[in-house]
Amino acid sequence: MRDHIVIKGARENNLKNIDVEIPRDALVVMTGLSGSGKSSLAFDTIFAEGQRRYMESLSSYARQFLGQMDKPDVDSIDGMSPAISIDQKTTSKNPRSTVGTVTEIYDYLRLLWARVGVPHCPKCGKEIRRQTVDQIVDQIAALPQATRVQILAPVIRARKGEHQKVFDDARRGGYVRVRVDGSIYDLTETITLDKNRKHNIEIVVDRVVIRPDQNRRLTDAVEIASALSGGLVLADIPEEKREILFSQNYACDDCGISIEELTPRMFSFNSPYGACPTCGGLGTRLRIDPALIIPDPSKSILDGGITASGWNGVKNESISRMYYDALAEKYHFDLATPIGDLPEHVREILLYGTGDEELTLHYDTNRGSGVLRRPFEGIVCNLERRYQETQSDAMRASLEDCMAETACPDCHGARLRPEVLAVTVGGLNISEFTALPITEELAFLDRLTLSEKDAQIADSILREVRSRLHFLQSVGLQYLTLARSAATLSGGESQRIRLATQIGSSLMGVLYILDEPSIGLHQRDNEKLLATLRELRDLGNTLIVVEHDEDTMRAADYLIDIGPGAGVHGGEVVCAGTPEEVARCERSITGQYLSGKMKIPVPAQRRTGNGHALVIRGASEHNLKQVDVQIPLGVMTCVTGVSGSGKSSLVNEVLYKTLVGKLNHAKVRPGKCDGIDGVEYLDKIINIDQSPIGRTPRSNPATYTGLFDDIRSLFASTQDAKLRGYSAGRFSFNIRGGRCEACSGDGLLKIEMNFLPDVYVPCEVCKGKRYNRETLEVHYKGKNIAEVLDMTVEEALAFFQNQPKIRDRLQTLMDVGLGYVKLGQPSTTLSGGEAQRIKLATELSKRSTGRTIYVLDEPTTGLHVADVARLIDILNRLTDAGNTVLVIEHNLHVIKVADHIIDLGPEGGDAGGSIVFTGTPEDCARCAESYTGQFLKKELEGERSSPFLIG
């Protein structure tokens, strides 16, 4: 068997006909600047070829359902293994997917609860046990010898009526006695019951004395009693004045509730047999949220304090104003009073109505005036009714602005039916178990005690569950719960979950290709991840990891540096070998940083800010423990902490959502906190995340940054355009006139292929240029509009050197390291890091007010350390303009250059949510309680930066 994967002539995207040899059964890290060609080699070449070869091994019938894969642009790849890609782009957004379902642990839990779960009555909570005839007989026969037992069949339990038919049937059946409400009656006499009272009626089947020779008779009596009552047997022991009720069913005999045979599907919230009927197994419902109807309680009704559709009371002649005037008159309040200062009962009436109480409404319209008397249904009730009744998508969308996901009123977020939630193992139902963090779940399973029979049944199930939970713990996800929605996971978390699943499968001889598995992981947990990767390698697999993390690079068996630059300046193998060999390579930027020859310097002086601060009081969203924290304004603040410590809850849920509501007037429900002070010192908040800059190929860097407007205006000002009467609109590919109508300005035509994936082919009319012939005849400096869109930022900067407005925008794109990106490159082809840097460039090109707060969540994702240096420069420029920059980050290069650190923890999940430290990086490095401080201390001392320093 080959000991290397040999790639010859790889030319995919920007790769320059490169040859690479990758050792098998090794941990191989590919690194290089953003856009250098790492993903082109790892995913678009190696993985794509592995997938294509697997597809070719299938039958043509199977292939028609899977679609056809193009051969990558490569001469040959030898020594390939079956390839599995674990990237960050395949995170499930389905609200039904949870950590438990994605890892398949929930399937084992469903089996466990179905096989050894103890059912209880969902109404009274009494344990329900089902017993066979033999088990019932054995229990009765175990009573002391010579004990007299009366076997009864409970045919009526707590039901009103005279029940004469029951007595008649018993007589016809040959039975002599019945017990009614505790008293024995002979069936030969007339029994009269009060039909308005509840009664208990039991037929006396037999009277038995406990002796070994009476077992046959006892068995017959139990079988008859069970048949008469539908599975119930009552053993009355007069001498002991006690009764024992036995049941062959899962049913509560007190409440009359029965449960069917327990099966795994009953515990699935994706099955109609188990899902809560109210929410359909989602655990949440979309409901009108009063906080979104009244986003600013400091405003009055007359000031537009109520923003819901149809209920703005600013206009005098509106119907809503007619109701408000009537309410104010009846309940004696002033419409000019801030809504938050109105009495509680008045706010309740505004939201939920007057019930049956009528209002006196005075109307005055073009058709006449008069008085009406009618109840007021309330704004919340009105909006919910309109949402249910409307046929208009626009109205539905408008009303959804006032709605929020709330826990289901019946299952309270547990997703399952009440009878399913009443089944417990070790005292917990399946929902309560999955709501525990993984560490607590493991502890629960370790102390779980089962009967000998149940332990035998559960042994193999528990072994599988434990091993999978341990794998999740080994990749640093011990703070997650199995009930956590997969849609709320970060890219790094979802990737590590799939990594844990792969370890659990114990495959060998596989080629795994991973995309930055360290994203979102604190340095403390990095060693766990590396141990996991080594374990996967030691099983006999080859790992190709696209990664920028220095710890991972140093742990690699083989390191491949792609570059030297990005885009057209990349696509070559700069250096390949052990980490030590790459560190000695003068040409490798990665090597320069590994050796310590290049470093991101620590600032000589920290900014102190403008004297003002944002003060968050009593933040308690998710795992935050009523934290109070100050964020100084005019500085760069880094929020740090181990994974799951509460960073995103504090910054994204509490701070961002509160400020975006107050400053940008967005309708969002902020995370729980007592209040935020200091908002008056800011004028806007901007979240610069890694979401795409557009959802369609029509969106591109030129359109997003506003650059294209200036370019179109420039083309419209040329002599050719003026002679033809062309305006700037002529050079838009989004509107009729200048665009190619054959493809509507897309440049591509979509061919639907039924079973096969849709195929995009260049438009035959415009040859992919998007514009019609007449528009392309207009030139500026010898280039038409399509040729300009095909330029890289770097080429365009030289081309538009004499156009200051365009040049300045292009320069900001160069400053953020996007010189290799084409102006017209579809936004759908840009990585998350590239999209984020385009947003940063757009902000840099705007005139600063010095009162903006920028929020960034792990902006170093996908960035090489050289790109991180450039990012830090941009963040410094934004801060130096007087703005405030707030960054959630694990990258020590960013943390060490921050002016202020807020460290959360100490652990993740329930053990987190507290402020461990606030202050400068130097003070943080001296804080022994801070995990971040421990690693920051090494970074500031320079130990971590240069283990391969060449003397």
What are these regions (language model features)?
Residues 1-951:
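Conserved phosphate-binding elements of NTP-dependent enzyme cores
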